UniProtKB/Swiss-Prot annotation:
InterPro entries for this protein: Alphabaculovirus_Y056
UniProt xrefs under Pfam families: DUF2719
Protein name: Uncharacterized 9.9 kDa protein in LEF8-FP intergenic region
Length: 84
């Protein structure tokens, strides 16, 4: 499943980039995933919008210490993955 998610975000326009330059962010409870190029605040807003469209809401209350970027990969309870 994770491989199919990673394939979803691989762009054919940026094939010159190294695979380690691609990152995605995944909510471990509802499996909402998006590119890590968005800020943490944008991710949380997208996550809320995603979950309002479905009957079962995600119980994940994000703990955010830095809302501007995904630096150090420890600032949010979402998971930060490099694409292989």
């Amino acid at each position: 499943m994770l491989r199919s998610i990673m394939r979803r975000f691989k762009s054919t326009n940026n094939l010159s980039k190294k695979p380690s330059d691609y990152y995605v962010v995944l909510c471990p409870k509802c499996y909402f995933v998006t590119s890590a190029e968005v800020s943490v605040a944008e991710y949380i807003e997208m996550h809320k919008n995603f979950n309002t469209k479905f009957a079962d809401r995600c119980p994940n209350d994000f703990i955010v210490t830095n809302s501007k970027s995904w630096n150090n990969h420890e600032n949010c309870s979402a998971l930060f993955y490099p694409l292989c």
